Design a protein with these regions (language model features):
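Conserved phosphotransfer cores of two-component systems
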Residues: 43-45, 68-74, 92
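Receiver (REC) domain active-site loop signature in two-component systems and cognate sites
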Residues: 56
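Conserved acidic segment of CheY-like receiver
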Residues: 2-13, 18-22, 50
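Acidic catalytic/metal-coordinating carboxylates
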Residues: 34, 60-64
Length: 124
């Protein structure tokens, strides 16, 4: 069964491109274009991992990630952003960071790295 990702980004072009790329990599993908919609999807669906853009109108990704970690601490969250320096506070509760300027495959690789131990634990 494919792992389910929640991808959150207010940049609709990047949202579409990454949705397609992640599906091509074999993941089931839920998408949201803002923090409020993301938290609703997160509360209503099983999610193996969330990818959250940092800068979004209304609610930045750090607050979205913190709320996700509060609701379900075991779900990994990756910040995907053009911001190269994140506050230590943000780094303390997220599971990874990938720059939007990186090749899209960098995000796919980071997701795989984080989920691999979880796959092994489920299989064993």
């Amino acid at each position: 069964m494919a792992e389910t990702l929640l991808y959150v980004d207010d940049n609709l072009h990047r949202l579409e491109v990454m949705n397609a790329r992640l599906r091509l990599a074999g993941y089931k993908v839920l998408t949201a274009s803002n923090g409020t919609a993301a938290l609703k999807l997160f509360a209503e669906n099983y999610v193996d991992l969330a990818v959250v853009d940092y800068y979004m109108p209304g609610m930045n990704g750090d607050l979205v990630a913190l709320e996700m970690k509060t609701q379900r601490p075991g779900v990994p969250v990756i910040i995907f952003s053009g911001v190269f320096t994140l506050a230590e506070m943000v780094i303390a509760y997220v599971d990874g960071f990938v720059s939007t300027s990186d090749d899209p495959d960098a995000l796919v690789k980071k997701i795989s790295e984080i989920l691999k131990p979880r796959r092994s634990a489920k299989a064993g």
